[in-house]
A protein has these predicted regions:
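Zinc-dependent deaminase catalytic domain
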Residues: 1-110
Length: 110
């Protein structure tokens, strides 16, 4: 999974902070749906990788019951944890027993 996340992270658009994030949601059928962060100059209207992955999953016809686990990787040495808005989305759209895996840029997972 870490290698997939590193490949996906290359697509992030982080021209302001240069902090890239990749997210992969694994579905019950083991299909992977991806997302990356997209920054905007105003700093407010960008999108987190988790938000993009969730939107992509719904766009592809999946529903909340299809979500199996979520993986998030950031481009720094620190473990990338979902922000407060993404935690709210995870709480709303994912079942309580959904596994959340958070990685740093070296693939260390928590």
């Amino acid at each position: 999974m870490k290698e997939n996340l590193k490949l996906v992270m290359k697509n992030a658009y982080a021209n302001i902070s240069n902090y890239k994030v990749a997210c992969i949601i694994v579905m019950q059928n083991n299909q992977e749906v991806i997302g990356v962060n997209i920054e905007n100059k105003d700093g407010k209207s960008g999108m987190c990788a988790e938000q993009v992955a969730i939107a992509n999953a719904f766009s592809e016809g999946f529903s909340t019951k299809d979500f199996k686990e979520i993986h998030v990787m950031g481009s720094s040495k620190g473990i990338c944890m979902p922000c407060f808005m993404c935690r709210e989305l995870l709480h709303e759209y994912f079942l309580p027993d959904t596994k959340v895996f958070c990685y740093n840029n070296r693939g260390k997972c928590k």
